[in-house]
Design a protein with these regions (language model features):
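Conserved hydrolase catalytic core segment
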Residues: 94-137
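Alpha/beta-hydrolase-fold enzymes
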Residues: 120, 125-191
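Catalytic micro-motifs at enzyme active sites that drive phosphoryl/nucleotidyl and oxygen chemistry
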Residues: 29-33, 87, 109-111
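Conserved acidic catalytic loop of the alpha/beta-hydrolase fold
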Residues: 63-74, 78-98
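A general structural signal for short secondary-structure junctions and capping/turn motifs
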Residues: 32-35, 115, 162-166
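Short, amphipathic alpha-helical segments
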Residues: 74-82, 102-106, 110, 114, ...
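Short, flexible loop/turn elements at secondary-structure junctions
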Residues: 6-8, 46-49, 103, 127-130, ...
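N-terminal cap/lid subdomain of alpha/beta-hydrolase-fold enzymes
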Residues: 1-61
Length: 191
């Protein structure tokens, strides 16, 4: 089985005690659980372009000694899945019982069904969707970054001023999941 992660987490989503945006999947992993380690070989690799370890815009370009920054090649969903496929080939995995993932990991699972339908028996796309939530498309997000005074044409590394837009983008994303309503119901205003 392949477990795919979202933008704001990594393979640590399967590690007990790790707190990630999509919530820990550690309770789902182990003998007799949905991700049954007695029945399946479970792989959860880091996503291409992720800030949690694989190559991305903040990776050092060996030709310049600086981060790739805006010169980093564009990555598509198909690219991410192709890299996962290549990893599985190197591990000797020829068939997957399932590909499952939350959030953007769910999009990856769906892409697996499109790119390698004969290799995958089932997909699980959880807390995901077929389209971006309204106002959170890749282009609108890129434009919000480009309009920020600290953007500097994409050369913003080490500039703490980008934190405010990243924080607001995360809040907006969580609101689109309905978490604001959930929190209001669980933690009513004491006033």
């Amino acid at each position: 089985m392949l477990v795919t992660h979202g933008y704001t987490s990594g393979p640590s989503m399967l590690v007990p005690g790790h707190h990630v945006a999509e919530s820990s999947w550690a309770p789902l992993l182990g003998p007799g659980r949905p991700l049954d380690t007695d029945r399946f070989f479970i792989v959860c690799s880091n996503m291409l372009g992720s800030s949690f370890g694989t190559t991305g815009p903040n990776t050092t370009n060996p030709a310049t000694g600086r981060p790739w920054g805006p010169g980093f090649p564009a990555i598509t969903l198909e690219d991410i899945v192709a890299v996962q496929h290549r990893l599985l080939q190197q591990l000797g995995v020829r068939h997957l019982r399932a590909v499952v993932g939350p959030s953007y990991g769910g999009w990856q699972a769906l892409q697996w069904a499109l790119s390698f339908p004969d290799m995958v028996d089932a997909v699980g796309s959880l807390v995901s969707g077929l389209t971006h939530p309204k106002g959170l498309s890749a282009e609108s997000t890129r434009q919000r970054f480009a309009d920020h005074p600290a953007w500097n044409g994409g050369w913003h590394y080490g500039d703490a001023r980008m934190t405010d837009i990243l924080t607001e983008l995360r809040r907006q994303t969580l609101r689109s999941y309905g978490l604001e309503t959930l929190f209001e119901a669980r933690m009513p205003d004491p006033a």
